[in-house]
Amino acid sequence: SAAKKAAGDYPELDALFVRQLEQQEKAEAVFFRQPSLEDITAPFASLLGGLLEHAPKDDALESEYREGLVYAGRKLGQWVYLIDALDDLEKDAEKGRFNPLSGEGGPARRAEALRILEEAEDQIDAVFSLLPFYRDASILSNIIQLGLPDVRHKVEKGQTLRPL
């Protein structure tokens, strides 16, 4: 299968995915005892940051640029986790599935999630504005400056995202 081939070709990334998804499961298991959106998003944030850390090596991208890329990846992972939680809120409630934005304290956590999402968008934009892109800069800029906020606004209004 494609997953087995990828795991064989990239064992470090496979180990990262397995480790972070296990951490995500553990974080979700204790969430309602210690509700922290920072803690619940950390494993997925680490997964995306780690994925970008393994981006092809390029001398021009080393040192501070790679650190910035990893940081932006972590913020994007946090954003993806929270936007998915907001988007799936009703469906998760209907099916009795875990969602960090439901239950007691849910409305306050939803407001906090929206604040974190907007903050993450700003931080991703700030980091990407400092990175030296040699191609596709306008596409990335549109995704970061227009796409992410547009998705957040749609989900905030209750519009369900279409599956890809």
What are these regions (language model features)?
Residues 1-43, 66-71, 92-133, 137, ...:
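Divalent-cation-assisted or electrostatically stabilized phosphate/pyrophosphate-binding catalytic cores
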Residues 29-83:
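A mid-sequence, solvent-exposed acidic-amphipathic segment
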Residues 89:
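Catalytic P-loop NTPase motifs of RecA-like helicase/translocase cores
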Residues 128-160:
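C-terminal domain/tail detector
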